[in-house]
Curated annotation (Swiss-Prot):
This is Alanine--tRNA ligase. Its EC number is 6.1.1.7. Binds 1 zinc ion per subunit. Belongs to the class-II aminoacyl-tRNA synthetase family. The keyword Chloroplast does not apply.
Amino acid sequence: MNSVNSIRSTFLDYFHLNGHKVLSSSPLVPRNDPTLMFTNAGMVQFKNVFTGLEQRPCKQATTAQKCVRVGGKHNDLDNVGYTARHHTFFEMLGNFSFSDYFKEEAIFLSWNLLTKEFCLPKDKLLVTVYHSDDVAAELWRKISNLSDEKIVRIATVDNFWAMGETGPCGPCSEIFYDHGDEIWGGPPGSANEGGDRFIEIWNLVFMQYEQVSKEERVELPHPSIDTGMGLERIAAVLQGVHDNYDIDLFRALIGASQEITGVEATGDFIASHRVISDHLRSCAFLIADGVLPSNEGRGYVLRRIMRRAMRHAHFLGVKEPLMWRLLPVLVREMGQAYPELVRAESLISETLKLEEMRFRKTLERGLGLLNEASSNLKEGDHFNGEIAFKLYDTYGFPLDLTQDALRCRGISVDVDAFDKAMQRQKTEARANWSGSGEAVTETIWFAVRDRVGATEFLGYEIEKAEGIITALICDGKVVDHISSGQKAIIVVNQTPFYGESGGQIGDSGIISSGCFVFEVHDTQKKSNGVFIHIGEVKSGQAKTFECVELTVDVVRRQKIRANHSATHLLHEALRQILGPHVTQKGSLVLPDRLRFDFSHPKSVSSEELKKIEDLANDIVLQNSEVTTHLMALDDAISEGAMALFGEKYGDEVRVVSMGNPLEPEGLKKRWSIELCGGTHVERTGDIGLIHIVSESSVAAGVRRIEALTGTAARLYFNRQDERIREISSLLKTVPADVGERVSNLLHEYNRLSQACIELRKKIILSGNTIKNNQEDITIINGISFMGRVVRNILPRDLKALVDDGKKQIGSGVVAFISVAENGKGSAVVGVTNDLTDKLNAVNLIHILSDVLGGKGGGGRPDMAQSGGPEGDKAVGALAALRASLEKI
C-alpha cells in the first residue's frame, strides 16, 4: 500500500540514489531567520545557501520538511477542517540543487519519479510554466511528450518565485494532477481553476535571476533548484482519494477521535474531527521543537491552535481533555520518521492535557456568553465587533474562536469594529505609560563596529591582558576621554572579560594604565561582536587609543565558572531522571547562585530532586577533566552534543564536555556534551558541591530550579545546621530528634485545636454566646428556625456549626452570622433535606447578604454562604430572614 510513510521513504530514497544527500528536517522554529515565525517551506533551511551567505559540503540535497502555516502571508488556520487540502501542519518533500544541475535535470527527475516510481498515468498530469519561460516549456515537451494543451503558460506572479524584494528569484513550473471530471473545476489558467479537479502536487522553482532592485534583475552565474511537493497531496493521489483527510494517516487519527468521543465523522461533525486531527499534528510537533503555550509570540500561536481544537472537541460533546488521548496514535504513525515525537511524548501529552484543563472553564463561559449575545442573529448577519472585543478583553475568549463558533451558523464578525476597539484600548494604554528615558540605542554599537571592528575575546585562556581603547561612551555619546567620577563604557580591541551571553553574567574587574583606573561593574557582548565594559572611572583620565591593562576579578569568575559547569551537569541529570523531553528554556549564571529553566509539564517531586542532585554530584566527585573543542556543527551533533533551542550557531561551534558516563551510553563518550560559549572549570571537582535549593513554575510547561555550588553551598549548609541547633535547644532535644519532637508537638497542637473547636461549637449551639440571639429554636409557619450571631468564626467552621445545628433541630432552617474583628460579616444558611423542595438556601442567603451589604452569594439548595462589610447589621439580617419565612 502507498502509505504516507512509504511515500516519504520512496521520495527520499529516489533522490539519494540520484546523488542527493538526505538531510533531516530543520526545526519548526527557524534557527537563523528572524523574519519567519515558523518554518513554512523546505527551502527555509537553505535560504543562506541560496543567497551565498553559507556554503554546504553537498551540491544536491533532499528533505522531508515539517512545516507550519498559521499567520502572515501563509495562514491556513481559518480554512482547516472545511476544505479538502488546508492544514496548519504538513510535510513538504523537496529536492535542491545548489549551483549544480538546473532545469533539464530537475524536470527529468520529477517526471521520472511520478511516472516510473509512483506509476502515475501520464494522461492525468499537466504542467504550468511561466509565460516567458520557453526553455522550460521545450524541456517538458522533450522529456514528457506532453501536448501543448498540457503545458500551460501562466503570466501571473503565482508562477514566478522571489525570496523578497531583492535576492534570488526565478520562474516556476507546477505539476498538476487531474482527479477526474466527476469533480468540479478547470485546469490552471482557466476561469474555473479554483475548483478541486486539478490539484497542484509539485512546484519546481528555477532560481536563475537575482533581483538587484525593483527595476533591475540580472542573471545568476550559477542558477539553483528548489522544489516542493506536499506529502499529504501526493498521498491522496497515490491512495486513490480526492481528499487529504481520507489518507491513511488522517484515517487513523480521525478513527481514534471517533472512538474516544463516540461521535461519528458525519454531517456537521466532519469538520470538527478534521480540525482536531490536523491541530494535534501542529501542536505536537511545535511542542517537540520547544514551543510551549504562552501569551506572546510563537507560544501564543500554539495556544490559539490548541484552543481552536478544544472548541471543536467541545462541539462534539467532549467534557474531558481529548487531544492527549489521541497523541499515541500520532506517535505510532509518525514517530519513526520524526523521533523527536517519541522523545518528547510525555511533555507533549502533559502540555496538551494541562492546557485543555485550564481553558475549559474559559471556553464554556465564553461560548455561553457568545450564544446569549448572538441568540437573535440569523444566517448572513454580522456579530457586533465591540461585543467580540469584550469577550476577548474581559473573558479571555479569542476573536478567532468567536469567528469559528459563529461560522457554522453562517454569521460573520464585524472585525473592523473589533480592531477599532482593540486600537482604542492600546491608545489609552499608551497614554497612561511613560518611557524609561533610556538614551542609548543599539545603533551606536554598529557604528563602533563599523569604525574599529569586533572585539577579540581572550578570556578562555587568560584572565589578564593588554589592549587598546577603541571607543569611549559617556551619557549615550561617543567621547574621546572620560575622567574621575564619570560612569562610562569602554570598548577595547581585545579583552579577557567575558561578555554576558548564554545566561552567564558578564565579568567584572579593573581596566587601568599609568593615567587612570576604571572599575568594570559589568561586561556585555553585543550582537555584532562588540564587547562593552560598563563601569566608573575611579581615578585619572582615560583616552581613546590608549594602551591599557585589563584584569578580571578572578575569584568572582571562578565562582561563575563553577556555577556554569554545574548547569551543564544539572541539565544532563534532569534529562536522565525526568526524561529526554527536558530541554533548556533559559538560565542565569551568577557568582553566588545559578538558575536553570527547563521544559517539563509538572512539578518535580522531592524524591526526583534528590536523585537529580545526587547524580550531578556523582560527576563532581569524579573530578574528571572538562574539555573544549571547536568542531563542525554537524559533527558536534552527531557526537551527541546538545544544541540549545533558539540559539544561533555558525558552521564551527565550541563543544564543552565533562564527566565520564556512569553506565555505557552507546556512542556517547562523555556524560555531558553541549554547545556552549561560556567559561567553565578545568575539572568537575572544582565545582565542589551542587545543592538544589528550590523548584518552581515559570510558565505552563516550564519549571525552574535554583542551586548553589562550592563555598555558597557550604555556607548554606552551615546556616541550616546552625538553625537546627537553635531549634533543638528551644525544644530541649538533640538535633537528631528534632523531627520527631516537632511532629509530636504538631500532633498535640492539632488535638488541642480540635478540642477547642468542638467546645466552642457546643457553647455556640447552647445559645448563650450573644445577648441578641433568640432563645433556642423558634417555630415559624411550622418550620423550625435556629438563627444566631457569633464572633470571629472562620467560614469553614461556620459551615460545620450549621451542619451541627441542622442535626440538632432535625427539620428546619439554620442561619449563623459571624462578625469578625474588622466588622465584616460572614453568613451561612442551611436547609434540612426534607425542606429543599420548597426552601432554597441560595435564595435565603441572598436576604442576609442584602442586609450585610454583600453581593449575592452561592451554594446548594441545602447549604449556601455569603457575607458583607456591614457585620453590625447581623441581628437585623436575621430579623429579615425570619420575616421572609413568615410570608411563606
